[in-house]
Amino acid sequence: MSLRNTVIALATAALLAPGVEAQELIRLDLNIPTSRLVVYEGDRVIKSYPVSVGKASHGTPDGNFSITHADWNPDWRPPQREWARGREYTPPGLNNPMGRVKLFFMPLYFIHGTPEKESIGTPASHGCVRMLNADVVALSRLLHERAAPHVTKAEIDRILANPRQTRRVNFREEIAVSIRYEPVVVENGTIRVYPDVYDRKAVHAEGVYQALMMGGYDVAGLDMAAVRTFVERAKNRRTVFQVPVAEAFASLATRAEAVSAP
């Protein structure tokens, strides 16, 4: 066997060996009402961070986006917006409004750090997604491991040690970002309804059906009257409303249970 064929065979064997799996692409998911940014590897959750989204008057945009680069130690330039009138340029530094790093996902909108720790978990920004500085640094390190491996951990440490010098890192692969607005969520047998922070009238029967289906439930025989009763109990609340699915919809079964039933 030639040297070339030997190398190919060894590489193939390594990939197919038990316990050796190729890393799946990382993607980010933000459901605005939950104020949490979730990191997925394939379909597996690997990280979850509390965030601050845009306030009702300056909502965070929803849709599908991608992150192409990171700016470490960013400056802040007031955008051409009414709310920024009279604001002054802020150079890079520990107290910069952008924090230690910002991740661009669409013009004028970023995922970034913040010195305003108390804002995390609330709709408080002008549309950007704010994170605790420690969290956005940890997230950015993870993205660099997958999409910019040429920038080492030691190099990032050196960048962070000089907070007044901005450094841009371009990713070799785009990081997918999904931002959605779904106040009704079903997880681990519990149905939760988050405050409708943008007053979109988004707590409704269709949203309940969708959340239950996404949670693995068979909604074919779901009683519409029970759904309407639940919506009336849950809507227009300022805090999270949650109950076990079995309590809200007593006769509802998961799809797996429905299939296995005699």
Protein language model annotation of sequence segments:
Residues 2-262:
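N-terminal pre-domains immediately preceding structured catalytic cores
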